[in-house]
Structures are given as C-alpha cells and as structure tokens.
Amino acid sequence: MQVKCSYSSNDSVFTLGRVYDVHIVYGNEAHRVSDCLALIDNQDEIWIFRPTYRGGEISGIDFSASFERY
C-alpha cells in the first residue's frame, strides 16, 4: 500500500504531497512485539503507522503527520 502525506508538522520528516510506501514490520516473539505497519521518513527513520479508513496517521513527541491512500 502507498500513502500520500496530507499534513506534516515538520516537512523535514515527511514532505507534504510525497508518496510513501507502507511496510509491514514483523514482530519478534522473544520480545513480544506484535506485527505493525510502518513508514520510513526522509531521514530513513522508522515510524509506526496507524491506518485509518482514509489513510493513516503518525504521531510522536512534538510531531504529527496525516496520510491519505494513494
């Protein structure tokens, strides 16, 4: 799945209008981490992606971004 950034509180992290690939991150049973969806930002950092009907969201300390399905 691909999503397009529709809002970013910091353009150096996610660029407005840019298309990003949604990646599946598989959990590690030893660490009890479940599978999740993730996006990779402009600096190659991984963010947990919370999907919604229209796209999805990312949030962190002093940062948020919204995405729409592309």
How would you describe each model-predicted region?
Residues M1, A65-Y70:
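Short intrinsically disordered terminal tails
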Residues I58-D62:
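Extracellular interaction modules
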Residues Q2-E57:
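Basic/aromatic-rich interaction segments and small domains that mediate binding to polyanionic partners
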